[in-house]
UniProtKB/Swiss-Prot annotation:
It comes from Aromatoleum aromaticum (strain DSM 19018 / LMG 30748 / EbN1). The gene is zapD. Pfam families: ZapD (PF07072). Belongs to the ZapD family. Cell division factor that enhances FtsZ-ring assembly. Directly interacts with FtsZ and promotes bundling of FtsZ protofilaments, with a reduction in FtsZ GTPase activity. GO terms for biological process: division septum assembly; FtsZ-dependent cytokinesis. This is Cell division protein ZapD. Interacts with FtsZ. Its main location: cytoplasm. The keyword Cell division applies.
Amino acid sequence: MRAQPVISYEYPLNERIRTLLRLEDLYAKIAHFLGGDAPQDHHVALLTLFEVLEVAGRADLKVDLVQELERQRQILISFRHNPEISEQALSGALYEIEQASSSLLAMAGKIGQYLRENEWLMAIRSRASIPGGVCQFDLPSYHYWLNRDPEQRRGDLEGWLRPMIPIREGLTIVLRLLRASAQPERQLARGGTYQLTMGGRGAQMLQLRLAPAEAVVPEISANKYAINIRFMLSETVVRPRLAERDIPFEITFCSL
């Protein structure tokens, strides 16, 4: 029997996880557009790289990732010689964490500083902040670059991205562990609303799963004390309205 389709929504409960989710989304977009050959694909990939530079530079991200990876490494080490856990799988996970940590520690200086020191790239970044600011008459050298062979452009983009790959690898491991940290619970939002007192739950992220056929979108407000979810009718023309009916959904309280 085929699994029923679901839409997953994730809501971070602290700034650190919020930053990791944003970066994960940006790295995925870069990978998508980097795979294309059209000048527009590589234009979007470059602008998205500038977004990664902006988001990653707001916090001491490298230190946070290294510390979290080390904490997870110690937890995994404590599972050694547990007959219920595969030693091979455990060794593989430890190796992956250790490699990611080593790559992060090898990153020198401020994240993305090499990009900030590239005057040509920073000129593009500056013009890109202006609506319609990267037309060929604004940046003829960029227009020339966009008309180069796709493989040459892709090589340049990969070179600019490569030093920031350790960030992507580190956050991928952390978010994977976070998502696998708990099991979903089935709940019912009566009259389209769901409220819960956290009661000491140390959740760092909420994950909601809904059937697309419900045609609703969750509006989530949460802190360490309580969560409030309102399921709104999916509207693209008028202001969303509360779905005044019972909505079945799954919720996962993810925490490392």
